């Protein structure tokens, strides 16, 4: 086996063993593009070798998806197959593990009417709401990993041949996911422990609010009374550990739904719905987005915010140091899984139940009462920079440094 094949094999093994931590007799579901079938086959192989009972692959084809957006009647985007939504719910109910492989060309739907994209996102969000609750409350094991496709690689490395661009992107993915380490599994265990030290400190301090300051950003975010910081490894309902994102460099919690005030500016392009949104600013009053400006993709961003009532509010606050390995690579991935781990970020839309103390056991009404935002969407956008300072504000109004010049201050 050559060096690349070995790395690809190791990466697939990590997705199965560290990502979702497949258990004997478990169902496994893989969502992936036909563009990265060789990698997906390795995932399937390792899942069965770990004892999976049945591995199902939901294949997507980017070009087929694009043809639908170009040629299908508008009403096709206002519906989502009930059998597919119910199938996912049933699998989640039975404790399946879900692996999502992201590889799409960030410009796939460039030039497509934003209303078509918004209609589909809304229909899918509504249909998959119950399934996503299993995911967002960590009832089941799930992970998101990246795989290099020609379309994505060309965007990240323009001017290179297709073969070279794909090779370069794979190498960056391997670096970011610790595949190149002597013992990748142990490297992930060590990384998990390091992130949990930050989580423990923030949970101990239990700040009432955060204040962000940087060029184009002056934002105060109140945190719910029962907020909990999380990061790296998670534990599902059955007590099994898993790693929801590979890579991951973040520690995160949720904001008080109505407690966000001020202005925040993006620092990296946002890839959303097959389009790129760049250089945007959001203004908040009492938690709600009241003004949107973007140099590129403003219509797409506005459609996102108009998805439902909850998409006018934030659902996640995540801290990532400017000197994180992905940030230091100085590569813009045009993919949220990677770019969010190079930068502090926020998320428009739904919050995670596990970010509230006892949240996994709470009803929807109880969670809302505690300040959790509900939405059919959840979209991260990047706001971190090397000049960003963040203060933690205690219940009695004392300020303590969390970030200085883009990096941890404790």
UniProtKB/Swiss-Prot annotation:
<dbReference type="InterPro" id="IPR000787">
    <property type="entry name" value="Peptidase_M29"/>
</dbReference>
<dbReference type="InterPro" id="IPR052170">
    <property type="entry name" value="M29_Exopeptidase"/>
</dbReference>
<feature type="binding site">
    <location>
        <position position="340"/>
    </location>
    <ligand>
        <name>a divalent metal cation 2</name>
    </ligand>
</feature>
<dbReference type="GO" id="GO:0008237">
    <property type="term" value="F:metallopeptidase activity"/>
</dbReference>
<keyword id="KW-0479">Metal-binding</keyword>
<protein>
    <recommendedName>
        <fullName>Aminopeptidase AmpS</fullName>
        <ecNumber>3.4.11.-</ecNumber>
    </recommendedName>
</protein>
<dbReference type="GO" id="GO:0004177">
    <property type="term" value="F:aminopeptidase activity"/>
</dbReference>
<feature type="binding site">
    <location>
        <position position="378"/>
    </location>
    <ligand>
        <name>a divalent metal cation 2</name>
    </ligand>
</feature>
<dbReference type="Pfam" id="PF02073">
    <property type="entry name" value="Peptidase_M29"/>
</dbReference>
<feature type="binding site">
    <location>
        <position position="380"/>
    </location>
    <ligand>
        <name>a divalent metal cation 2</name>
    </ligand>
</feature>
<feature type="binding site">
    <location>
        <position position="316"/>
    </location>
    <ligand>
        <name>a divalent metal cation 1</name>
    </ligand>
</feature>
<feature type="binding site">
    <location>
        <position position="316"/>
    </location>
    <ligand>
        <name>a divalent metal cation 2</name>
    </ligand>
</feature>
<dbReference type="GO" id="GO:0046872">
    <property type="term" value="F:metal ion binding"/>
</dbReference>
<feature type="binding site">
    <location>
        <position position="340"/>
    </location>
    <ligand>
        <name>a divalent metal cation 1</name>
    </ligand>
</feature>
<keyword id="KW-0031">Aminopeptidase</keyword>
<keyword id="KW-0378">Hydrolase</keyword>
<comment type="similarity">
    <text>Belongs to the peptidase M29 family.</text>
</comment>
<keyword id="KW-0645">Protease</keyword>
<dbReference type="InterPro" id="IPR035097">
    <property type="entry name" value="M29_N-terminal"/>
</dbReference>
<feature type="binding site">
    <location>
        <position position="345"/>
    </location>
    <ligand>
        <name>a divalent metal cation 1</name>
    </ligand>
</feature>
<feature type="binding site">
    <location>
        <position position="250"/>
    </location>
    <ligand>
        <name>a divalent metal cation 1</name>
    </ligand>
</feature>
<dbReference type="GO" id="GO:0006508">
    <property type="term" value="P:proteolysis"/>
</dbReference>
<comment type="function">
    <text>Metal-dependent exopeptidase.</text>
</comment>
<keyword id="KW-0862">Zinc</keyword>
<keyword id="KW-0482">Metalloprotease</keyword>
């Amino acid at each position: 086996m050559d060096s690349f094949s070995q790395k690809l094999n190791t990466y697939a093994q990590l997705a199965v063993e560290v990502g979702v931590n497949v258990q004997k007799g478990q169902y496994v579901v893989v969502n992936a593009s036909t563009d990265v079938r060789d990698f997906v086959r390795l995932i399937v192989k390792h899942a069965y070798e770990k004892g999976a009972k049945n591995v199902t692959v939901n294949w997507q084809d980017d070009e087929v998806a694009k043809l639908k957006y170009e040629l299908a009647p508008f009403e096709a985007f206002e519906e989502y197959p009930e059998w597919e939504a119910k199938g996912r719910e049933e699998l989640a109910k039975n404790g399946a593990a879900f692996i999502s492989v992201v590889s799409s060309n960030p410009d796939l739907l460039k030039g497509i009417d934003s209303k078509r994209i918004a209609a589909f996102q809304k229909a899918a969000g509504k249909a998959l709401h119950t399934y996503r609750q299993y995911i967002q409350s960590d009832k089941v094991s799930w992970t998101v990993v990246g795989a290099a496709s020609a379309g994505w690689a060309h965007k990240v490395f323009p001017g290179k041949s297709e073969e070279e661009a794909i090779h370069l992107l794979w190498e960056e993915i391997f670096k970011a996911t610790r595949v190149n380490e002597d013992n990748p599994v142990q490297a992930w265990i060590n990384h998990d422990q390091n992130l949990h030290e930050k989580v423990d400190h923030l949970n101990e301090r239990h700040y009432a609010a955060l204040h962000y300051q940087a060029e184009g950003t002056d934002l105060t975010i109140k945190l719910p009374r029962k907020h909990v910081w999380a990061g790296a490894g998670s534990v599902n309902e059955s007590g099994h550990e898993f790693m929801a994102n590979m890579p991951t460099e973040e520690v995160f919690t949720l904001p008080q739904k109505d407690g966000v005030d001020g202005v925040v500016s993006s620092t990296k392009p946002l890839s959303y719905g097959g389009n790129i949104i760049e250089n945007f600013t959001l203004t908040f009053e009492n938690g709600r987005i009241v003004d949107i400006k973007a140099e590129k993709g403003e219509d797409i961003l506005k459609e996102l915010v108009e998805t439902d009532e909850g998409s006018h509010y934030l659902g996640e606050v995540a801290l990532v140091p400017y000197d994180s390995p992905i940030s230091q690579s100085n590569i813009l991935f045009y993919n949220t899984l990677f770019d969010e781990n190079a930068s502090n970020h926020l998320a428009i839309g739904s919050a995670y139940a596990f970010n509230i103390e006892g949240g996994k056991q709470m009803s929807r009404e109880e969670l809302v009462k505690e300040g959790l935002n509900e939405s059919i969407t959840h979209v991260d956008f990047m706001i971190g920079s090397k000049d960003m300072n963040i203060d933690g504000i205690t219940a009695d109004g004392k300020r303590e440094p969390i970030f200085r010049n883009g990096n941890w201050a404790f």
